[in-house]
Amino acid sequence: MTIAQVRDELGAAIGEYWDNRAQTYSNGIQSELAGYGRCTWQRVLAHAIESTCDAVAREGRTMRALDLGCGPGFFSILLADEGCAVDAVDMSAKMLERARANAAQAVPGASIAFHQCDAADLPFASESFDVAVSRNLTWLMRDPEAAYAEWLRVLRPGGKLLVFDANWYRYLVDDDVDAARRSDQANAQVYDKGSRATDDEERRCELIAAELPLTSVVRPQWDIQVLERLGATRVSVNEQAWQDLWSADEQAYYGSSPLFMIEARK
């Protein structure tokens, strides 16, 4: 089997997994939108794209934003709230169904176009977007360096890339992280069952993660090196982002894989 065939097979498994998770994942997004998450993430997003918004406004046009791996539409909604014309992509048809429904409820009439595609193979012309955002996506990339190159391709010169992610599933290759995870998650009641994966779904995701390249690297150091090698500028990272952005329950449950935030310019 060729490398391309292996990646295609893995991609199909990833798509099937997230189709199955669409409803429970959407439940979590709806909770965020209704509570702690929306204003907290909105504040961080608004601050991160403020200078880009100002520059676009001076040009007299609407800012174009790309939501990469949009899932049930959380960032699509926040970007629309910031006045952006949003394109949102996801490989899961069922996630896109939930995203459309959530957006229709949260930001009726907003300019959001949803597209089913691989986030590493985008159907957009080069230099199309002023900002591109992803959350909990990069770890899933079968060729993450190529994905970063693709995301930079579709950004306009001076455009901004925001990446929120964590060392998800590193516990599969690191015994210390695994011990910390088991301790954090000993009390499973701390996190809402209605938005969590089932035990069977979690095992399936572990099998997927075991085949993904970023499971075994140290991040965000890897990301910084790759982005700079690809020509991104003003690359910075906030490794304490989880303290500002996660709820107390998320911090308790996922503390062994803390969320980081990467900012970069094209």
Each predicted region: which residue ranges?
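Conserved class I S-adenosyl-L-methionine
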Residues: 2-60, 75-78, 160-198, 241
